[in-house]
Amino acid sequence: VGYGMTECAPLIGYIPWKKFKQGSCGRVVDGLQIRVDSDNPSREIGELQVKGQNVMLGYYKNPEATRNAFTDDGFLRTGDLGTMDRNGNITICGRLKNLILTANGQNVFPEEVEAMISAI
């Protein structure tokens, strides 16, 4: 089981299937740092941020997008929301900007729609 993105060439987390933990997408791969942007990363959902040699240097000919993609201390903002337990198991909970903009300008979050449908 793994987790990654193109900007991280491509792996962020991985765990062999024999060590799989329900709901987790693995532990951070060697040579990469990960943090959860929250006050309590094991219980409180926050944006996953990564830093390491396999992380891109920036977007080609797009310095503004590059500036927006990184924190002041050089961590890449993944846009993924998640937690990390004390053993380093990463759990993805959603996307930071996962929303649908309706014709009247209202923000609709797919997770809220899914929860309402599941409750029926």
PLM features per residue range, with description:
Residues E112:
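Phosphate/diphosphate-binding loops
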Residues G82, M116-S118:
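Hydrophobic C-terminal alpha-helix "anchor/cap" residues
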Residues A9, N104-V108:
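Alpha-helix capping and helix-loop boundary segments enriched in small/acidic/polar residues
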